[in-house]
C-alpha cells in the first residue's frame, strides 16, 4: 500500500484523506522522506485538570510509563506519591529519569513497583537495595516490548510543550522510547510545560491522543557535562579525534569523554551526527559548520538523535530547529540503519575492561550502575558501516587510583560489549 500511495499524486491522496476525521497519520522514521503524510484531525481547546484529578484514573495493578531524562514529569510523580494510600502494586517503568521521583522511597515499596529499563542515579539505590527491578535490554528493543504487548501500558505520564494552533504538542527533548509508549498506552496524562522545546521529527502528539492535561511551568533538568571534564578526559578526546576522518558520522554516548571528544574536533570538516543522545558539545561545532551532516546517507543535513541532555543553552538551540530530528529509538539505534551512514564512529564509555576485551559498562562488580542502553546497538552499527570505528573509551584508573584495565572483571560484573565486538580501546595513554 505504501508503494501505491507513493506513486499516486498528492492531489489524489489528499482527496482520499480530507474527509477522514479523528484519525492521526503518524510518520515513521523508516518511511522514505518522499512519502506524503497528511494529518486530518479535529482540534479542540484543551482543558486543564489538577494533578490530583488527572492521576485518579490510575488504579492498583496498573503499569505506568514515565517519560525520561530531562523530560521526567516530577510534578506528576510527586502527586502520585500523595495518592499512595489508595494504591497497591502500581508498576512504574522507564529508562533514565532525573531528579527526585519520590515514588522510589522505601515507604512506598508496597504501593509502587519500579521496573527500570536503565538504571539512573535517581533509582540506583532502590535497585541495589532490592526495592526496584532492572531489565537488561538493548535500547533499540524497548519499543517492541510496548508494541508487542510484552509490557502493555495502562497509563503514560509524559511532559509536553503547549499545543500549537493545529493542536500538536511536542514530546520535547526525549522522544526515544516515549514515541512507542504514547502510541500504545491506553490512557495518556500530560504535564504541559511552556519550558519544553518544540522539536522536529517524531516528537509530535495531537491533543486528541491525550486524555488529561496538567499545567506546570517547572524548569527542565540540566546537566553540564563540560564542567566535569578533566585533563585525562581531554587527552582521551585528542586521541579519539585522531581516529576520526573528515566526513565521519558520530555517535557520542553519555558522559564526560564524549564531550571531551567534541572539544577536540575544531580542525575537522563535514561531520555528521546520528546518536541516541546529544549534549552541549555539538553547538560550537554546528556554529563553525564542522558539523553539517552533508555526507550522511540517512537523513542528510539533519542531526538525528533520540534525546538530549545538557544545559538550557542546548534546549534553546534545538527548540524549533529543523536541523535536528528527534526520532523513535527503534530507528535511531537500529544497527542496520546506523551502518548505512559512512565512517560511523561510535564513542562509548566503560567502567572496566579486561585484557581479553570484555567491556563492563553497567555495573561495578555486582552493584548495578547504569544499564545496557544503546552501546551494543552503535558498536555493531559502526562495525558494519563502511570505514566505521567502534570505540570504547575510559580513563586508565578510577578516582581512587584503582586500575580499570584488569586481568579479570570483578565478580558479578556484567559484560555489555563482548570481546568479539571490540575494535578500539582508548585511554589517556
Give each language-model segment a name.
Residues 2, 8, 25:
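Cationic, low-complexity basic patches in intrinsically disordered or flexible, solvent-exposed regions
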Residues 9-10, 32:
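Compositionally biased low-complexity segments, especially N-terminal hydrophobic helices
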Residues 35, 40-429:
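Conserved alpha/beta enzyme-core scaffold
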Residues 6, 13-14, 38:
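N-terminal non-cleavable signal-anchor helices
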Residues 3-4, 19:
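Compositionally biased low-complexity segments enriched in histidine and/or tyrosine
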